Amino acid sequence: IDEIRRLSTFFSLSVSDGGSRVAIIDCADYLNVNAANALLKTLEEPPKNTVFLLISHNPESLLPTVKSRCRELRLNELSKQNLFSALKQINVAIPENDKEIYSLLGGGSVGKCIRLLKYDGADIYRCILSFLNQLPNLNGFELEKFVATFSGTKNRGRLELLIELLNLSVARASKAGVLGPNLTDQIVKDEIGIFQKLCPNPNVAKKWAELAQTQSKNLNHGLSVNLDPGSMILDTFFRIEDCAKTI
């Protein structure tokens, strides 16, 4: 919320060339309730000659009152060739063996790829798939060890990425029940086989889709109110385990 309040100071400054002022909020998905409400007040009565750019990877997570005051501009993802070219231009190197993983997880976004690389996103996703492969019975000792690496203020960025990848994995599992072997763009080896085992048909896909929706909402709320990361992530995995046991 302090960052949002600093916008008032920014808007009080004069523009030397008489042009517009631009405020970029990246990423709006992680605004807590207080910050979102503070932003809403500014959006309701925006300063003159001001443009707000709210970057959101999941627009449905934004407050409806914030969304109603915005225009949606969808940006298409870059092709793999253009993505790697852009990363090369800014001297960001991707390990050759992980290029496919990062291009798919990054969804054609240069910024997202940089973030994934910063927090070892490929390894986090592989770990998630490893736990999903244990279902319907998770190894509690291994899981607690894994979850412990996301605790603490210094690991906030890794925690946010873990949540995104957890949501992605459950959503992809639900798609497997509908698309089967036609699920495209396998991110890691044996991924489709794991998802097909968890979600063999459209009826089961409905259960995973419902879990994906609830899970995303709960985790975003947990982040916004600063719930204990360990408890929040363990609870999420146990809910996934419970869902797998009903199949």
Which residue ranges define each predicted feature?
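Conserved strand-to-helix beginnings and helix N-cap segments that scaffold or border functional pockets
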Residues: 4, 33-37, 160, 230
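Conserved catalytic/switch belt of AAA+ P-loop NTPases
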Residues: 12-14, 37-53
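Helical "lid/switch" subdomain of P-loop NTPase nucleotide-binding domains
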Residues: 3, 23, 27, 31, ...
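Conserved adenine-binding aromatic site and its adjacent loop/helix in ATP-hydrolyzing domains
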Residues: 9, 41, 64, 68
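Clamp-loader machinery-focused feature within the broader ASCE/P-loop NTPase space
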Residues: 1-34, 196
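Short, surface-exposed loop and linker segments with low hydrophobicity and enrichment for Pro/Ser/Thr
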Residues: 28-31, 40-44, 153, 157
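Charged, glycine-rich active-site and insertion segments that engage polyanionic ligands
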Residues: 48-50, 57-165, 169-247
